[in-house]
Curated annotation (Swiss-Prot):
Name used for this protein in its record: DNA repair and recombination protein RAD54-like
Helicase C-terminal domain sequence ranges: 493-647
Assembly and interaction partners: Homohexamer. Interacts with RAD51.
Organism this protein belongs to: Danio rerio
One Pfam family named in its UniProt record: SNF2-rel_dom
Length: 738
């Protein structure tokens, strides 16, 4: 086209000084002579040019108005064949047009569909309101692609529970998977799904609070970042001034809308309890309580603060829901789904008393039958809101774990001190009806420390405390606690051998766990004496520093050989896969605490065969603690794992023998089994083929000498002070390495 005929040039000429504003402008009006001259040179085959505007001649305003409306009523069409658009993207405030769709494709390979709308016939579809039809709820493919089969099942169970589809008018559940099965990832998947979608094409919830022990706040923050990247920004709080924390909590709880900027709050139990008033002022879509067995006491302040939250949906994570008794188990179930087991008094009368009566070793056949009936009734109710998978699932993904309970003889000094204490303190007199009274707790602590090393009770000997009067005469001359002397403790002697053999014959790293920081002090002295590089984590270490030293220790190139861990401070949730050997130096009354600590190395990412050593002093209170653990573990197993034939070998009345010393045994625990697989202390028949580390100790291998051991390191350490060993492996080794 000639430039002079362009609309912009024509308009300029029209607005010139000679133009008449009142005269209608017709862009197609051109002198006839110019048009005839130009058309001489146009090919007869060329299509005629169309006018610059298709505006028809409008005789009146009505026709013009109708024409404009017709133009504006035509929707814009993207010139791509079969283009339907991405309905999942935000529409910048405009209402979306078109049929409601799921956020993700439910028919894609590997899609995890949590909800499938009911099928509607074509006839009903015509009459249905298209704006109210439910859609599929599909887990984000970024997450569903990394979920293992048991985790996909777990996410589906969690979603069904918190949306009220399993129990009417109940929106809570307990995730009771054992350690290492990915409970955190399953909960993050649930959170992300609820925040983004629902059958009604909108988010199910707007805000989530994750409450965890302070040592795991940073871990949760990192896990959210790991799996969700930058798509969500969580707020993590575990420290700071009161005003600063209150300000952050007010900002969080006051957020409103379909998609708020910071929808996830991660907070420690202690901080939540202190600032609960702020969080009680708003509504929260979901509350997740990690290590939820902290809520076993329904009367403590943390439980009351959390239970007062305006949050229907509640998920409690606990690998060990039963720790001490069934009433604590009731508290956990009552927290997530209030009322399904009645009141505490009703639960005790209806379930707890008959079940415990039937589980006692002295129970009659009638009591056993009644207890079993009540147990099945309880299981049928609770299983609707509790999911539990045991760690045997991990055998598909993790290397073999060899767990060993090592009984160590007391040294002559320990025996003399032990007998002196029992003679002077007379702790048996403080026991009543097989239950541990408050007055006997100090005696228990003294005996446990003596089993670890005489150095731990040396101060009491100096001051002549009850039970240790005249004990100084038993110590070697010129004895000093400044230097550790392994030869004075049977367990310390065995530990010294284990560390030396591990250091010289393998490339493995070791985690040392104890309930007492004083014992960790002894470990430090031993490491300095043997020139082992080590790191230590206890309650004095800040959360930020904990994360740094764990990351450094897990680095294969780091020189640290030993990681010392206080089970009270860091036994839960830590990932220490840089080591593959773990020593539990002293037992805890609660089997859950020991299991949590022992699960630090046998976790996702571990590549080497794991060896767990549980050291006990032979014939002492430590073996009684192990026996009490067996009772608690059997109780947990029969209620949560639903095992039918969990053996109970110990009557509650036998706890009266707690304060005694059996000097003539290789293992007091093995003696109580009345084991039929062993003859004269030697195993003649192996345990059942399907037995593993989760079984009762009676179904483990029993070794009165080192010939039956599978661990070369423990074999080499036997002659130090070992009297008896129970050992079992997690699963059959698929790679030929044991």
């Amino acid at each position: 086209m000639r430039r002079s005929l362009a609309p912009s040039q024509v308009a300029k000429r029209k607005q010139g000084p000679d133009s008449d504003d009142e005269e209608d402008w017709e862009p197609d009006m051109e002198p006839q002579c110019k048009r005839d001259c130009r058309e001489k040179y146009i090919s007869p085959y060329r299509k005629p040019l169309t006018p610059l505007t298709n505006r028809p001649f409008c005789a009146d305003g009505n026709e013009h108005e109708a024409f404009i409306r017709k133009i504006l009523s035509k929707p814009f069409k993207i010139p791509i064949p079969n283009y339907t658009g991405v309905l999942g993207l935000r529409a910048l405030g405009l209402r979306r047009a078109g049929v409601r769709k799921a956020l993700h494709d439910p028919f894609e390979d590997g899609a995890l569909v949590l909800y499938e709308p009911p099928v509607i016939s074509a006839h009903d579809l015509i009459k249905a309101d298209k704006e109210k039809l439910p859609v599929h709820v599909v887990v984000d493919p970024v997450l569903s692609k990394v979920l293992r089969p048991h985790q996909r099942e777990g996410v589906k169970f969690l979603w069904d529970c918190v949306t009220g589809r399993r129990i009417e008018n109940s929106y809570g559940c307990i995730m009771a998977d054992e350690m290492g099965l990915g409970k955190t990832l399953q909960c993050i998947t649930l959170i992300w799904t609820l925040l983004k979608q629902s059958p009604d094409c909108k988010p199910e919830i707007d805000k989530v609070i994750v409450v965890s022990p302070s040592s795991l706040v940073r871990n949760w923050y990192n896990e959210v970042g790991k799996w969700l990247g930058g798509r969500v920004q969580p707020v993590a709080i575990d420290g700071g001034s009161k005003d600063e924390i209150d300000s952050k909590l007010v900002n969080f709880i006051s957020q409103q809308g379909m998609r708020i900027p910071t929808p996830i709050l991660i907070i420690s139990y202690e901080t939540f309890r202190l600032h609960a008033e702020v969080l009680h002022k708003g509504k929260v879509g979901l509350v997740i309580c990690d290590e939820g067995h902290r809520l076993k006491n329904s009367d403590n302040q943390t439980y009351l603060a959390l239970n007062s939250m305006n949050a229907q949906r509640r998920v409690l994570i606990s690998g060990t829901p039963i720790q001490n008794d069934l009433l604590e188990y009731f508290s956990l179930v009552h927290f997530v789904n209030s009322g399904i087991l009645g009141t505490a008094q009703e639960f005790k009368k209806r379930f707890e008393i008959p079940i415990l009566k039937g589980r006692d070793a002295d129970a009659s056949d009638k009591d056993r039958a009644a207890g079993e009936q009540k147990l099945q009734e309880l299981i049928s109710i609770v299983n609707r809101c509790l999911i539990r998978r045991t760690s045997d699932i991990l055998s598909k993904y993790l290397p073999v774990k060899i767990e060993q309970v090592v009984c160590c003889n007391l040294t002559p000094l320990q025996k003399e001190l032990y007998k002196l204490f029992l003679k002077q303190a007379k702790p048996v007199e403080s026991l009543q009806t097989g239950k541990i009274s408050v007055s006997s707790l100090s005696s228990i602590t003294s005996l446990k420390k003596l089993c670890n090393h005489p150095a731990l009770i040396y101060e009491k000997c100096l001051t002549g405390e009850e039970g240790f009067d005249g004990a100084l005469d038993l110590f070697p001359q010129n004895y000093s606690t400044k230097a550790v002397e392994p030869q004075l403790s049977g367990k310390m002697l065995v530990l010294d051998y284990i560390l030396a053999m591990t250091r010289t014959t393998t490339s493995d790293k070791v985690v040392l766990v104890s309930n007492y920081t004083q014992t960790l002090d002894l470990f430090e002295k031993l490491c300095r004496n043997r020139r082992y590089l080590y790191v230590r984590l206890d309650g004095t270490m800040s959360i930020k520093k904990r994360a740094k030293i764990v990351e450094r220790f897990n680095n294969p190139s780091s020189p640290e050989f030993i990681f010392m861990l206080s089970s009270k401070a860091g036994g839960c949730g830590l990932n220490l896969i840089g080591a593959n050997r773990l020593v539990m130096f002293d037992p805890d009354w609660n089997p859950a605490n020991d299991e949590q600590a022992m699960a630090r190395v046998w976790r996702d990412g571990q590549k080497k065969t794991c060896y767990i050593y549980r050291l006990l002093s032979t014939g002492t209170i430590e073996e009684k603690i192990l026996q009490r653990q067996a009772h608690k573990k059997a109780l947990s197993s029969c209620v949560v794992d639903e095992e039918q034939d969990v053996e109970r070998h110990f009557s509650l009345g036998e706890l009266r023998e707690l304060f005694s010393l059996n000097e003539k045994t290789l293992s007091d625990t093995h003696d109580r089994f009345r084991c039929r697989r062993c003859v004269n202390g030697r195993q003649v028949r192996p345990p059942p083929d399907d037995s593993d580390c989760t079984c009762d100790l009676s179904n483990w291998h029993h070794c009165a000498d080192k010939r039956g051991l599978r661990d070369p390191v423990l074999q080499a350490s036997w002659d130090a002070a070992v009297s008896f060993v129970f050992h079992q492996r997690s699963h059959e080794d698929q790679r030929g390495v044991v």
